[in-house]
Amino acid sequence: MSQFTYKYTTESELFSFDFNPVLNTGETLSTATCTAITAQGTDPNPSAVLSGSPVISLGKATQRVVGGLNENIYRLIMTCTTSDGNTYTCTGDIPVYSPTAT
């Protein structure tokens, strides 16, 4: 699991997962699906932090993340299929804070 640096509720950022260490020589990512859950805190709709679909480039899958609720930790679950028929999953936690919270 990856631990990403925090983001503010007001930010829109890209978060990438590097699958290159597990890919065989010549193997490429074919599809990517990203899911968001709340790892800590409460959010009735954690998938709302996902903006658009993941983008695949050079063995990495990247997802845009927006908003989120103050003091929650969101877990991104990125699952990719490959040209060799393999399926790999990476996860990463993103702490979210409000820039105006005291």
Predicted ranges, named:
Residues 73-77:
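Short, conserved beta-strand segments of beta-strand-rich sandwich/propeller modules, principally
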Residues 1-27, 96-102:
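Predominantly extracytoplasmic/ectodomain segments of secreted and cell-surface proteins
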Residues 21-31, 40-45:
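Extracellular acidic loop/turn motifs
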Residues 86-99:
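C-terminal edge beta-strand
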Residues 79-83:
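Beta-strand-rich extracellular modules
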Residues 59-63:
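Short strand-edge motifs at loop-to-beta-strand transitions and within beta-strands
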Residues 66-72:
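Surface-exposed, short loops/turns at beta-strand junctions within beta-sandwich domains
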Residues 39-58:
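Low-complexity "stalk/linker" and mucin-like segments enriched in Ser/Thr/Pro/Ala/Gly
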